[in-house]
């Protein structure tokens, strides 16, 4: 096997919550890392940036011409209003990416990050189909509903046959990690919510369902996700396999929520059985409050919409089902890494404080 110093990787979505972690770990291991993203903000130092529109097939071919990466990590997606649109757009992104990779260009492995909507269904038909019992296993049959994850997988499998590379699929749960201006960032969303509630003298109210409050759940640390993606891309045991990826522990929000409230010095309240209290509703007037907090503390970002993804946390915490995964397949294949979910949450809070994104307490 070649040494890491002459190995080249391409990360699509490099400035995202998982892309940043993948890039950082590869760079630490001596890889040459190229990253494709819409913006350069959040690009880890040492990454060779590529700016191209994933929906423009010609632009993708021009941007990747001659690159010849050994491994490609696909972590980007584009959120649309309906699943039909998600399928069209996100199917096109991976198709354009794979078409832009030269058939004889040295690509050995392509790793695709998806998630638990593989088992739950898409956002516009969320948890309405007949689902398997928890914990979710990788060999569960697909749901009988349209899902852009299925479309992306099928495109990946077909390209692998034609172009001769191996593949892996990584189904993460809610990701705890570091990124700004990210579509799905629960740690930063809940942290911003807690800071606003503290300033307003209001309680840190659980916005979701009693089922989510009381049920067993797991999450995925972004660095752990990166470790599994890299492992599957460099170990034969990861070839042509789909893997769940979660921290390895489980918890109930009724246990973790009070700890988060205490960490931020704010009183908390559990869910109301008769009605959700969604963050999108609670935080509809958050923009000027956060702007004042940012000005007072000299924070780097005053636009709350670049920090908090209210809709995503509402979606995750509003589930009326229990949701966690089985990690046996990954462990049996040799990936034994794990994380503590509470430590993951609070270590990321400290990272945001250190970066002057959150107030330093």
PLM segments and residue spans:
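Glycine/proline-rich active-site loop of Rossmann-fold NAD(P)-dependent oxidoreductases
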Residues: 163, 177-193, 231-243, 267
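N-terminal Rossmann NAD(P)H-binding glycine-rich loop of SDR-like oxidoreductase domains
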Residues: 2, 6-29
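Mid/C-terminal beta-alpha module of Rossmann-like enzyme folds, strongest
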Residues: 226-314, 318, 326-328, 332, ...
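Conserved Rossmann-fold NAD(P)-dependent oxidoreductase catalytic core, especially the SDR/UDP-sugar
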Residues: 85, 92-148, 168
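Conserved glycine-rich Rossmann-like NAD(P)H-binding loop of the short-chain dehydrogenase/reductase
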Residues: 31-42
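Substrate-positioning beta->alpha
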Residues: 151, 185-189, 208-233, 240-241
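Active-site Tyr-X1-5-Lys
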Residues: 140-173, 178
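NAD(P)H-binding glycine-rich loop region in Rossmannoid oxidoreductase-like domains
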Residues: 41-43, 51-96
């Amino acid at each position: 096997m070649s040494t890491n110093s002459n190995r080249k990787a391409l990360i699509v979505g490099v400035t995202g919550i998982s892309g940043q972690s993948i890039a950082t770990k590869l760079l630490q291991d001596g890889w040459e890392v190229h990253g494709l993203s819409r913006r350069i903000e959040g690009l880890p130092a040492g990454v060779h940036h590529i700016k191209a529109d994933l929906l423009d097939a010609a632009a993708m071919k021009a941007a990747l011409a001659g690159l010849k990466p050994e491994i490609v990590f696909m972590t980007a997606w584009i959120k649309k209003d309906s699943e039909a649109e998600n399928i069209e757009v996100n199917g096109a992104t991976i198709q354009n990416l794979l078409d832009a990779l030269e058939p004889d260009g040295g690509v050995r492995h392509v790793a695709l990050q998806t998630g638990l909507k593989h088992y739950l269904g898409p956002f516009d038909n969320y948890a309405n189909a007949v689902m398997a019992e928890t914990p979710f296993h990788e060999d569960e049959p697909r749901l009988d509903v349209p899902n852009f994850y299925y479309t992306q997988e099928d495109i990946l499998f077909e390209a692998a046959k034609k172009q001769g590379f191996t593949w892996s699929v990584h189904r993460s749960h809610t990701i705890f990690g570091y990124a700004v201006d990210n579509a799905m960032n629960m740690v930063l969303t809940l942290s911003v919510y807690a800071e606003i509630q503290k300033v307003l003298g209001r309680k840190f109210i659980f916005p979701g369902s009693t089922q989510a409050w009381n049920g067993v759940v797991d999450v995925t640390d972004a660095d752990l996700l990166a470790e599994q993606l890299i492992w599957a891309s460099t170990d034969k045991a990861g070839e042509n396999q789909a893997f769940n990826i979660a921290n390895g522990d489980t918890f109930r929000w009724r246990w973790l929520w009070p700890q988060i409230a205490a960490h931020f010095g704010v009183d908390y309240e559990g869910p109301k059985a008769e009605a959700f209290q969604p963050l999108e509703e609670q935080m509809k007037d958050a923009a000027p409050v956060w702007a004042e907090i940012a000005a007072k503390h000299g924070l780097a970002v005053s636009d709350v919409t670049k920090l908090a993804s209210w809709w995503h946390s509402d979606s995750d915490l509003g589930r009326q089902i229990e949701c966690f995964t089985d990690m046996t397949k990954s462990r049996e294949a040799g990936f034994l890494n794990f994380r503590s979910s509470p430590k993951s949450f609070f270590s990321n809070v400290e990272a945001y404080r250190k970066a002057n994104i959150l107030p330093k307490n």
